[in-house]
Regions:
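Metal-centered catalytic cores of metalloenzymes
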Residues: 2-5, 14, 19-77, 81-145
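Ser/Thr/Pro-rich, acidic low-complexity intrinsically disordered regulatory segments
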Residues: 9-10
């Protein structure tokens, strides 16, 4: 009897915990960065790619941005939002100047509003140069399973 009660309690605990585990997801984030995606578009052969992950349980965003053919060294880089394609927005996540040489690697823990905007596709990443201080290459961030 006691053993059956223990097994029943264990089964109930697993059943109740399973939906919580299922709700957490590791998502892939990506963006193709081009000069044509800047607002307004820029004249540059620069291009790049963002790859990374977003953990919905810890709210941690990890990124790797690789770029090349800019008009000069990167002077700044940021995640911006919320903004749809073709619109500009303020900085959501700054990237330290010491991390600017390609590849740019980093991580940040997002707030609830930041997570909402990221998952809605309302963030973009851009890389700035001295010739293009408003941004030389840009890409809209998508989060997918």
């Amino acid at each position: 009897m006691k053993r059956n009660l223990t097994l029943s309690t264990l089964a109930l605990t697993i059943a109740l915990a399973s939906p919580l585990v299922a709700m957490a997801d590791m998502l892939n984030v990506h963006a193709d960065l081009t000069a044509a995606s800047e607002v307004p578009p820029k004249a540059s052969d620069g291009h790049g790619q963002l790859t990374g992950t977003y953990d919905t349980s810890t709210k941690e965003l990890q990124w790797n941005v690789v770029y090349s053919n800019l008009t000069g060294p990167a002077t700044m880089a940021h995640f911006h939002g919320p903004a749809p394609v073709g619109k500009n927005a303020g900085v959501a996540i700054p990237i330290a100047a010491t991390d600017l040489p390609s590849p740019i690697k980093g991580h940040a823990t997002l707030t609830d509003p930041q997570e909402k905007d990221l998952l809605a596709g309302e963030w973009y990443v851009n890389v700035h140069t001295a010739k293009n201080p408003g941004g030389e290459i840009r890409g809209q961030v998508a989060a997918t399973k």
